[in-house]
Amino acid sequence: MSAPFEERSGVVPCGTPWGQWYQTLEEVFIEVQVPPGTRAQDIQCGLQSRHVALAVGGREILKGKLFDSTIADEGTWTLEDRKMVRIVLTKTKRDAANCWTSLLESEYAADPWVQDQMQRKLTLERFQKENPGFDFSGAEISGNYTKGGPDFSNLEK
């Protein structure tokens, strides 16, 4: 079994004051830098379909309404190397046309260049999923790739 698309092609991160976030077709990843030596019991993390909240040692780091809905039961968080919290959210709408422009409705928006790169990456990931025999991890894309690229579903095979 080959590695996931994002492992082969890299990710397009959106930097924030507390770390970064990035997305794939199916998931949104949030990486929060916390003080070294942080213990799991120091972390309070609430994940709901449209809301996320994270506090470390009683200090609120992240809280708000998500850009779009997620599957609450599939959201997870982990503490890695006692210095980073990784939150993984599963998107409700899992297609290339659903490229989040920001993490929260009013905060942590990707700048126009990062947004463009995210849309390109999701479109390539879509092509990879539709054509598993090809490797699009090193491919470049230009032209019509916004909203997931062209729709070929009605073409005859």
UniProtKB/Swiss-Prot annotation:
InterPro entries according to UniProt: CS_dom, HSP20-like_chaperone, NudC_fam, p23_NUDCD2
Phosphotyrosine: residues carrying this PTM: 145
UniProt xrefs under PROSITE patterns: CS
Domain CS residues, every copy: 14-104
Chief location of this protein within or outside the cell: nucleus
Oligomeric and partner information: Interacts with LIS1.
Function description: May regulate the LIS1/dynein pathway by stabilizing LIS1 with Hsp90 chaperone.
Name of the protein this chain belongs to: NudC domain-containing protein 2
Source organism (scientific name): Mus musculus (Mouse)
